[in-house]
Amino acid sequence: MKKLLAFFTLCLALTTAYAHPQDGMSPEVLIHYFIKAFNDENIPALEEVYAFPHVKIINGKLTRFDTKETPVYDFVGLKKTGWKYTKINQIKVLAEGANSALVELNFSRINNDNKDYFQGVAYYVLTKDMGYWQILCLSTMGVVPGVK
């Protein structure tokens, strides 16, 4: 009986070890989770939110990120703009299928004086290739502080 209990405990531990925070999240909830990880400057969580490879199209310039070795965001540069945190104004799921989704995020950058110093819209193409939602592509129509 003790061996059986130990076996089930081991199985549970292994199952939990391979779980991802975004398991069971909807596309909208993933974007909320992403912004929280961004505001916390939680690089490991941000690396889990993004699929690799992924692309960013910022102001018409395409950048491909093949591995986690390339920083996903420039927090040093972002803080130089006075950034304190990013606020979600609105999230719209524009399209959602079984394994892909398109999400529009209207957001603001808030500075140390708690003032909105930048407002923008970003579009996220999400994939569920690994069984949970991840960002495959980020696109903005203009330059966004802190986004490479």
Segments predicted by a language model, with ranges:
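Short, low-complexity N-terminal intrinsically disordered segments enriched in polar/charged residues
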Residues: 4, 8-48
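Surface-exposed, charged secondary-structure patches
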Residues: 72-113
